[in-house]
Amino acid sequence: MTSGRLCLVTGATGYIGGRLVPELLAAGYRVRCASRHPGNLRDHPWAGDVEAVEADVLDAGSLRAALDGVDVAYYLVHAMGGGEDFRERDRRAARTFAGAAREAGASRVVYLGGLYSGGRLSEHLRSRAEVAEILLEAGVPVAVLRAAVIIGSGSVSFEMLRHLTERLPAMVTPRWVRSRIQPIAIRDVLRYLVGAAALPPEVSRGFDIGGPDVLTYRDMMQRYAAVAGLPRRVILPVPVLSPWLSSLWVGLITPVPGGLARPLVGSLTSEVVCREHDIAEYVPDPPGGLLGFDDAVRLALQRVREAGVGTRWSSAPVPGAPSDPLPTDPDWAGGSLYVDEREARTAAPPEAVWRVVEGIGGDNGWYSLPVAWRLRGLLDRLSGGVGLRRGRRDPARLRTGDALDFWRVEAVEPGRLLRLRAEMRLPGRAWLELAVRPGERGGSVYTQRAVFSPHGLLGHLYWRSISPFHALVFGGMPRNIVRAAVAGAGRDRTPTAGPR
C-alpha cells in the first residue's frame, strides 16, 4: 500500500534521484525533494508534482525539518572524490542523516551504494562501504542496494564507456579493462529502489544488485561498439597505466571531468560482481528477466537512433523512459551532439517568415551561397547519395515524410517549426531545424539550428573539418530568409486595383 506515504529524496538533482522521483510518483507515493538549492529542481519535468525543501546533509536542523512526517528516506548523496577529506565528509554526512532519520521516526532509509566483491577496495568504494555501515547502525530499518556500472544515458560510468568506445577505434588501455564487472540497466536499478520502499520492517541489510551479464570492461566496449554499429575496436591492454594516469587519459579523450573519472577508474581496478541475488525474494525479477547489457545500451541509444534527438533542443516534451537523458543532465551526458545555432529578428510577421521557411529548397533554393549547396549535393551523389536532384513535392507546402533535396521532412508544426533529417551520406546523423516565434511589436524571431550526432571517430573528425565552412553554408540563411519575408510581407500589403 503506497497511497499517501511520503518519500524524501536527497540528491534529486543528480542522475539517480532525478530519474527516481517520477518512478515514485507513478507508484503512488508523495515525494519531497531535499536540496541545498531547491531552485535547481525547477527544470525537471516533475517539479510541479513534488514538494521542494532546502536541506544540507551536513546540517542536522535542516534535515530534521526535511524528514518531518517522512515514511521512506532515500539517501542518494555522494562526494565524488572532492578533495583529500571526501571520505570524512561522506562519513559525517551519513551520521548526520542517520541521526535525523531516527529522530524523525522514518520507517525506512534506502541507500544506493557501490558493489564490491571483497579484497582491496578503491577509496571510492571504501567510502561507499563506510556510508552503508553507518546507515545500517542508524536504529531504523535500512536497505542498502549495491550496484556496479549503471547503463543509461547520463550515468557517469556509461558516458565514460560511450565516449571511449565511440572516439577511439584503436586504443592502448590499462590492465583494469580485464576486470570482471556486472553492469545493471538504470531501469532495473530504479525498480529495486522503488521496491525497497515496501520492504518488511524487519528487513535491514545490504543487497547486491546487478544485471544478467558478467563482462570485462573490454567486453563492454566491444559490445557497445556492436550495438552502436561501430567496427570492432582494437584494444591492447598494457601494465604501465596506473589508475591516476588512467583518469588523466580518460579526461583527455572524453568530456567526462577528471574529478569524476578518477574515483570511477579506481573502482574498476577491483572485481565488482554480485555475490548474491537475495533482493529477488522481496522484489521479484520482471517477466522475461532483468535487462541484459546489449538491450540496456540499445535503450540508451534509442533516442538518437529513432531521430528523437530533436527533443534535446526543441520544445517537445521530455521523454519518460529512465534510459533517456534529462534536460538537467550535465553537458557531457547523452552522447555527443554538435550544434550550429543562428538567429535573426525581423519586423515581418511570423506568418510571412513561415511562408519562406515552408517554401525552402528545390527550385526556391536555400537562401545562402548556391554554389556551396550544389557542391555538397555533387559530393553526395559521387559518394552514392541522393544529392539535390529530388527537389520537393510541392512548391509551397510541406508535410511530414516529404523528400526535400537531400533532406527528409521529419516534423512540421505549421507556423512554428520545420525539422529536416539529412539523408546524405554522413558519418553520423544530422538535422536542420528552422523555427519561427512571435517577436516584439508584431515582428518575429527566426531560429536556425544544424545538429550533428557523430558516428565514431570519423564523425567527430567530419564535423571539426567542415565547421569552418558553416559560415558560408548557414551564415547567410537567417539574414536572407528574413529579407525574403519582409519583401513578401510588403507585397501582401500592396493595394490592388478594384474592379472598374
Which role does the model predict for each range below?
Residues P454, G459-R500:
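A conserved amphipathic terminal alpha-helix motif
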Residues A422-A471:
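Beta-strand/loop substructures that line and gate deep hydrophobic ligand-binding cavities in soluble
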Residues Y29-R36:
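Conserved glycine-rich Rossmann-like NAD(P)H-binding loop of the short-chain dehydrogenase/reductase
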Residues L20, A27, G119-L230, L248-V256:
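Oxidoreductase cofactor-interface core, primarily capturing Rossmann-like NAD(P)-dependent enzymes
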Residues G195-P263, E271-R342:
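Mid/C-terminal beta-alpha module of Rossmann-like enzyme folds, strongest
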Residues R345-W354, E358-P427, E440-R441, N480-R483:
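Glycine-rich portal/gate segments that line the openings of hydrophobic small-molecule binding cavities
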Residues T2-Y29:
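N-terminal Rossmann NAD(P)H-binding glycine-rich loop of SDR-like oxidoreductase domains
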Residues G39-A104, G114-R120:
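NAD(P)H-binding glycine-rich loop region in Rossmannoid oxidoreductase-like domains
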